[in-house]
Amino acid sequence: MTNTKFVFVTGGVLSSVGKGIAAASMGMLFKARGYKVTAIKMDPYLNVDAGTMSPYQHGEVFVTEDGAETDLDLGHYERFLDENLSGKNNITSGKIYSQVITKERKGDYLGSTVQVIPHVTDAIKESILYGAQGADLAVVEIGGTVGDIESLPFLEAVRQLRRELGPNGSVVVHVTYVPILETTHEAKTKPTQHSVKELRSIGLQPDAIVLRSHTPLEKHVLEKTSLFCDVPLEGVINSYDVESVYDVPLLLEQEKLISVLEERLFGTTTEADLKKWKEMLSRQSERTLKVALVGKYVVLPDAYLSVIEAIRHAAMKLGVAAHVSLMSSDELEKCDDEQLSEKLSNMDALVVPGGFGARGIEGMVKVLRYARENKMPTLGLCLGMQVMSIEFARNVLGLKDANSTEFDPNTTYPVISLLPEQMQVRDLGGSMRLGAYPCTLVEGTRVHALYNKPVVFERHRHRFEFNNEFREAFENNGFQVSGLYEPKDLVEVLELKDHPFYVGVQYHPEFKSRPMVPHPLFLGLLSEAVAKASPVL
């Protein structure tokens, strides 16, 4: 079988209850005890991956080093564990069914009637074991809510796998929500009781329950949950709302959750080394920076989750607080110059993140012109870098029709155009330039100084690139190419001379930022903002 131990994390009562943060926190606390830890997210949707899903429904698509387009929870796992994960750490129903159907078409099942049990559940178990290879412990989060039809094959696979792993091979941690009535201020455990009943009916008994609530719960609520859900009192944990998601591991450690799980899995309890984590959280904020994030999908902040977290990481490192103002590029498109100045003049820095499609692009052009002309520290990511190029071509080079062929296929000045290998692509899923590629930095540039190394590996997710026909004109007018993918001579980084900080990158640096190791570009952006800003208490 395997020597890896498993923590299976299920969710009850409602979705978005915080399973991902709980799973990431547990993984981080086991790693702090010296274990080699990995994390796996199982998503019951029928999409093969998250790549073609709407950011309004699903939030951001997190891209791994190997180019997998995954659930945003993998971003939480990477940030908390400080480990690079891969496509094998995200299992979807679409991926599983695709594998099973492919095998059936090839005749691998030798004429068997292909069914959910055993064929689909076996494929799920194989994927879990493959994803956990080489780890002492794997935290496996089952997406959705117990009781969902889509989750049943995954929960059945977990039931079977637990049986095969033996009594000390795995634990189940059930994360539920405890509503508190406004009128009586009474915490209601009935939804949790029904959720556990549903979980038991599938054959899974939780070893621990994490009760999510807005405020701390009284002890009698935990005792009642313990009694009615048949979980030892020490295994019933209250995870109430805290100021930052990075406080959650300390809360779970305080509640001794990992001690309960470690004793069950490894027959021992050890101390966690949380010194550096606590030091990171203890830095005092002397001032608050206001950072404008101008994007297309700001209705759902999760669409820019990694960008927001990367800003926070840099802010913590610099000892400042960062207030991120989400601004819709659609709305800014309607503003005149005076209105635009009113919205942006009190901002200390600007980030324009990635996205797809023509909607809202002209709003970004307006914002970036303001930032360029008013010396506002600015970082453009992927689409943001492309719109920087469009704005510069129009307003500095005088190419009034300049555009990307994504937005205007017939533009006279295609400063951004389709990658040659993308010309014949028809399927959208998994067909972009994805994953980590080397970028060679030009010595003497701001970006080279920030990274302090000649070559960096950064993650990509795009089809369009800077058109080298315009490279000479850009550089002659002060927009310098400071990073290249040398094998194909692709422009990866642009930076504006004679500007405090105006940098555009074709990649997604936010995916590699970690709480204790902020990304150099976000550090550079906020450092410049700190230098320019007056203290705001």
Curated annotation (Swiss-Prot):
Binding residues for CTP: 15, 148-150, 188-193, 224
GO cellular component, one term: cytosol
Positions of the UniProt region annotated as Amidoligase domain: 1-267
Pfam families reported for this sequence: CTP_synth_N, GATase
Regulation acting on activity, per entry: Allosterically activated by GTP, when glutamine is the substrate; GTP has no effect on the reaction when ammonia is the substrate. The allosteric effector GTP functions by stabilizing the protein conformation that binds the tetrahedral intermediate(s) formed during glutamine hydrolysis. Inhibited by the product CTP, via allosteric rather than competitive inhibition.
Enzyme class of the recorded protein, top EC level: ligase
Molecular-function GO terms, alphabetical: ATP binding; CTP synthase activity; glutaminase activity; identical protein binding; metal ion binding
Binding site for L-glutamine: 56, 355, 383-386, 406, 463
Catalytic activity from the UniProt record: UTP + L-glutamine + ATP + H2O = CTP + L-glutamate + ADP + phosphate + 2 H(+); L-glutamine + H2O = L-glutamate + NH4(+); UTP + NH4(+) + ATP = CTP + ADP + phosphate + 2 H(+)
An example Gene Ontology biological process: 'de novo' CTP biosynthetic process
Amino acids binding Mg(2+): 73, 141
Active site, renumbered: 382, 508, 510
Keyword Plastid: no
Keywords: ATP-binding, Glutamine amidotransferase, Ligase, Magnesium, Metal-binding, Nucleotide-binding, Pyrimidine biosynthesis
EC identifiers of the protein: 6.3.4.2
Chain's role: Catalyzes the ATP-dependent amination of UTP to CTP with either L-glutamine or ammonia as the source of nitrogen. Regulates intracellular CTP levels through interactions with the four ribonucleotide triphosphates.
Assembly mode: Homotetramer.
PANTHER family: CTP SYNTHASE (PTHR11550), CTP SYNTHASE-RELATED (PTHR11550:SF0)
Protein family per UniProt: Belongs to the CTP synthase family.
Protein name from the UniProt record: CTP synthase
Lineage: Bacteria, Pseudomonadati, Coprothermobacterota, Coprothermobacteria, Coprothermobacterales
